[in-house]
Design a protein with these regions (language model features):
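N-terminal Sec-pathway targeting helices
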Residues: 1-13
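Hydrophobic alpha-helical membrane-insertion segments, chiefly the h-region
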Residues: 14-24
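Non-catalytic all-alpha helical scaffold/repeat segments
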Residues: 25-149
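Functionally constrained cores in energy, signaling, and assembly domains
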Residues: 6, 19, 70
Length: 149
């Protein structure tokens, strides 16, 4: 009887472990806003800083210049910075280079350098196979030229 109880306990723990793993993998904390995926890491990073990243991105994808500028100027650190770069790359594809250029034309050299770094990270480490491993000047030549200091 003791052995049966022990086997049932182990079986229950294994099942619970499998269920938890599957549940966590299926219910990741990422979100999709107007076709752009925002990673859980980026959501947590911005939420902890009181930034409504989804709202800013939602408005930016509709072409709002102020929201585009606000999104581009966010300072995102560590791993979330790579994800932010991926979001920027996807945003450029949705709204087009002209809207991005209008948003950045009033920025200073330091800001432009920061944006360049995010975009390059998004191109190198992003999850979009159409732009992965491409150079900024090849995929977005007009944005590249407007980001030069």
């Amino acid at each position: 009887m003791k052995r049966t109880t022990k086997i049932l306990s182990i079986s229950l723990l294994v099942c619970l472990s499998i269920y938890t793993t599957v549940y966590l993998n299926l219910n990741r904390g990422s979100k999709v806003v107007n076709g752009i995926e925002i990673s859980e890491v980026l959501l947590v990073h911005t939420r902890d800083r009181g930034i409504d990243y989804c709202e800013i991105l939602s408005t930016a994808t509709k072409g709002d210049e102020e929201s585009i500028r606000e999104l581009l100027l966010l300072e995102i650190y560590d791993a979330a910075g790579y994800d932010h770069g991926t979001v920027i790359v996807d945003l450029i594809k949705i709204v087009g280079e002209d809207k991005i250029i209008r948003a950045i034309e009033v920025m200073n050299c330091k800001q432009k350098t920061s944006i360049t770094s995010y975009i390059e990270a998004g191109l190198q480490y992003g999850n979009n196979p159409n732009s992965a491993k491409q150079e900024l000047n090849d995929i977005f030549p007009d944005v590249y030229n407007s980001l030069k200091c």
